[in-house]
Amino acid sequence: MGTHEYEDDPRNETVLISVNGKLLPRSEAMVSVFDAGFLLGDGVWESFRLHEGKLVFIEDHIDRLFRGASEISLDPGKSRNQIMAEINRVISANQMHDQVHLRLIILGA
């Protein structure tokens, strides 16, 4: 399988996604085409795994996210603790525990 391919996961059909703090079904989780992140590529993201209830290397991922945001003068808009609370809220709302891939995206406004 190539790097741009993925195996379909039936859990994705009912997944809730946080967009600006609102938990939305996948079909409603959208970003405006006028968003700076979409128009200008103004944003940062990190991808991480949930394995046996643990977020693997989460501190490293959050550090890298904040460094990347700083490098492009992007204010994440939330503290590390607030971001972690939102990640945990998404995990809880989706009853996630293992073999989960999460992506955190922060876009410019």
Each predicted region: which residue ranges?
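Conserved alpha/beta cores of soluble small-molecule-handling proteins
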Residues: 1-109
